[in-house]
Amino acid sequence: VIPPSITFVVYGSIADASITDLFKAGVIPGLLMGAGLIVAALVVGRKMDLKVLPKATGKERWKAFKDAFWGLLMPVIILGGIYGSIFTPTEAAAVSVFYGLIVGIFVYREISLKKIKDILIDSCSTTATVMFITMGATLFGYVLTRARLDLAIEGFMMNVTGGSSIIFFIIVNIVLLIAGCFLDSTSALYIFTPLFAPVALQLGIDPIHLGTVMIVNLAVGLFTPPVGVNLYVACGIGKIKIEEITKGIVPCLVAELVVLLLVTYIPALSTMLIG
């Protein structure tokens, strides 16, 4: 959610929305999501009486900052370049790759010629996956248009909502929370954006606001029990059972659902940074 976010780029390309504005729209919701997780962690920590680690010394903090400096500089370069109109979001991707290679080879010295080969292979594999998803989604959109199903769905949604943006967002949130458990964000955006965006325009909803709600929603869906994709990733890392993590995730899920409701029904949280 916090820029630079690939999901905002995907949504922007589908809905023909400004990616720069979408990046700005994601700042406050992203910070709210982070704050929600912090509050949940503090509550759980006090309830379980977890031990507090000793504070890091000034020397340790300075060392950690120096080690992380070049990595922290990347989002500054990307966002600064985009917001400063130095380069487009597409060009920012190329700049970030070049910067990452330079830092990895000459600063951290963790990238060798052999690793570059592996990186290129992994990049090709990832790109191919995304292209197949894009191809399928484009075909899906084409079939919707040719069969005029998009107009039928739009008419159905307008009848169900009765012209109410509140009811529309209730439907959007329920559908995406369920879809987010089973689908990755890119696939879900390609499937549902063409369905929801026209209805949102009919209801006078800002496409930037809709995109922010959809992406926050899908982020929550990724760790919503019982089948949230990120739950299984966390199980593999922590070497625990899905039942254990499902119980532990509840406070975080509640906090993020509260944030989702705030972002959904207070459009200013998404649009206040857009001049």
Task: Label each region the model flagged.
Residues V1-G275:
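Alpha-helical transmembrane segments of multi-pass membrane transport proteins
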